[in-house]
């Protein structure tokens, strides 16, 4: 099975070390463009663009990278409860059309009550997933070309429709990650690819089996992906030394503050990440070559595969054997590590190198009439 390898655009900051200004660098448009172009040339399938108040806006960043890349896809966040599904569907179709079919979407429900409150969202965990399920139903139906009337608990639309369809049919693929039962049920019923953070293989296997069974109950099959950091070097010793350097400027106070911030979230996935290290710096290799040091201060994906190219490739193939076909990777700093992964890891894997998409012809059209429909040629009798 050929593997889809994704990289990451660090719109929330970048540098050589975690938890310090030492070795940091400005993350401006030029730098993000360098990373995107490197990923494009090296054969990555796409890039994940993060979302949240600590990040630049993912949609604007993605749009700005379209003209400077050729085949790279952009995995961009959809935010239920923050955005109308109708507006989000129009945005998704436009991004897909402007990128010539290079748009992918990642459903992000949110987990930090403080950040959500700042965005005007005051739903609890179960309510957010109810809203996300309704959002996704409407979003998908619009992209499928339906005129949608929907009267749910959280979402209400009447006569919603898209005038301009996406390039990808039936619609651009939808990714999603969540560890709770309600999250897995949402994935099983509505998404195309289920993402997990980088837990040890036995825990990932358990999650995949759960989601696969739930999808089968809905008569569906879905794909699987995993989100990991990577520290790959020419030798295993060099890789482990690089891992230690990455957290060499962390102090106990910084770790404690980060863990306290993570503790206020209601994310089951974040709780599982924190349990891998319990905020302690010892015993961070939680599974062969799987290192939890990143999660001491970084929310979300908190584990890294560490080793030389063949070693990391072996660990990736272990995950692939569980049914995972997509790997969303990152490393610090992201420009240099994009090259290291491409040069030291890719030769040891069966990597699916994306082709440059051919321009898709769009039907000629006149201006929309009354902001309601596209004029069509009337058949002559």
Swiss-Prot record:
Keywords: Flavoprotein, FMN, Monooxygenase, Oxidoreductase. GO terms for biological process: alkanesulfonate catabolic process. The keyword Flavoprotein applies. Pfam families: Bac_luciferase. Its EC number is 1.14.14.5. GO terms for molecular function: alkanesulfonate monooxygenase activity. Transmembrane segments: none annotated. CDD domains: Alkanesulfonate_monoxygenase (cd01094). It catalyses: an alkanesulfonate + FMNH2 + O2 = an aldehyde + FMN + sulfite + H2O + 2 H(+). Catalyzes the desulfonation of aliphatic sulfonates. Homotetramer. FMNH(2) which is absolutely required for this enzymatic reaction, is provided by SsuE. Belongs to the SsuD family. This is Alkanesulfonate monooxygenase. It comes from Escherichia coli O139:H28 (strain E24377A / ETEC).
């Amino acid at each position: 099975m050929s593997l889809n390898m994704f990289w990451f655009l660090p719109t929330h900051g970048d540098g050589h070390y975690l938890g310090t200004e030492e070795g940091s660098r400005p993350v401006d448009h030029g730098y993000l463009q360098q990373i995107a172009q490197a990923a494009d040339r090296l054969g990555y399938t796409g890039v994940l663009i993060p979302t949240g108040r600590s990040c630049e806006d993912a949609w604007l960043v993605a749009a700005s990278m379209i003209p400077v890349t050729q085949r790279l896809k952009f995995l961009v966040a959809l935010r239920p409860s923050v955005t109308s599904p109708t507006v989000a569907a129009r945005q998704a179709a436009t991004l897909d059309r402007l990128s010539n079919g290079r748009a992918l979407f990642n459903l992000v429900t949110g987990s930090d009550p403080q950040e959500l409150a700042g965005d005007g969202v005051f739903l609890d965990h179960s309510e957010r997933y109810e809203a996300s399920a309704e959002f996704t139903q409407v979003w998908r139906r619009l992209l499928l070309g339906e005129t949608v009337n929907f009267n749910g608990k959280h979402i209400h639309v009447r006569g919603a429709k898209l005038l301009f369809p996406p390039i990808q049919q039936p619609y651009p693929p939808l990714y999603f990650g969540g560890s709770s039962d309600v999250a897995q049920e949402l994935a099983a019923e509505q998404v195309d690819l289920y993402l997990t953070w980088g837990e040890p293989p036995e825990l990932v296997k358990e999650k995949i089996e759960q989601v696969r069974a739930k999808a089968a109950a809905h008569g569906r099959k879905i794909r699987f992906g995993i989100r990991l950091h990577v520290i790959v070097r020419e030798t295993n010793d060099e890789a482990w030394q690089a891992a230690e350097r990455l957290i060499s400027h962390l102090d106990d106070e910084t770790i404690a503050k980060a863990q306290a911030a993570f503790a206020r979230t209601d994310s089951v996935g974040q709780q599982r990440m924190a349990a891998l290290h319990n905020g302690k710096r010892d015993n961070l290799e939680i599974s062969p070559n799987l290192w939890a040091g990143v999660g001491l201060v970084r929310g979300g994906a908190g584990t890294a595969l560490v080793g030389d190219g063949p070693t990391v490739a072996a660990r990736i193939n272990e995950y692939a054997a569980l049914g995972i076909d997509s790997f969303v990777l990152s490393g610090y700093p992201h420009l240099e590590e994009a090259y290291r992964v491409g040069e030291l890891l890719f030769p040891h894997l069966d990597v699916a190198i994306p082709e440059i998409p051919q321009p898709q012809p769009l039907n000629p059209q006149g201006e929309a009439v009354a902001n309601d429909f596209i004029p069509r040629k009337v058949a002559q009798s």
